[in-house]
Amino acid sequence: MENALRQLGDEKCAELRVDLVRPSMDEMKGLLAKKDVSYIVTCRPGVFDEETSLGYLTAAARLGADYIDIEIERGTEVAARMKAACDGTKCKLIVSYHNFDCTPSRDELRSIIAECRGRGADIVKIACKVNAPADNAALLSLYGDGDGIVAFGMGEIGKISRLASLGCGARFTYVASDNGEGTAPGQLTVSQMRRCIEGLAS
């Protein structure tokens, strides 16, 4: 937890991976009390049992997280439960789809977006392995399908889509801290992303 706080520095938006940081409820409460930081809280499967994982996310929504993120694979009942946890709070629900092998066709991606929205997603996150430049084009084309989409590619070829997504309408993108490891292939560091944005703005 202390290492996570050091990596956060003075950033204004951060993803809290509960499965990686493993905070106590008191530690998470203290972290979310920092009103000058917007938090996306997620707990990927494989570390905690399902009830513990969902308990963390429910608590995060009620303690002031801006977003909680669940995977599409967790099913409709979990999505409904997490949507209910957000009711009456400022917290928004992200339903995410990850494909670490390839980028599906545009039609498949649009079907995935519709499925996520059908589960109550305020934000749909799509992250796919990019194996060819055309995959970047497919992912970025999704921004024409309405608001509330964060779509980008993973892997070396997909790096450019992480930057381009901001110009296409993404509310945020994901970067690695300068003094820590990334959580997905192809992530730029905070400093690298800032240099890219500043270069485009100059």
Language model features with spans:
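Conserved N-terminal beta1-alpha1 strand-loop-helix module at the mouth
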Residues: 1-54, 62
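Generic hydrophobic/aromatic pocket-lining and core-packing "Φ" positions
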Residues: 2-5, 28, 57, 79, ...
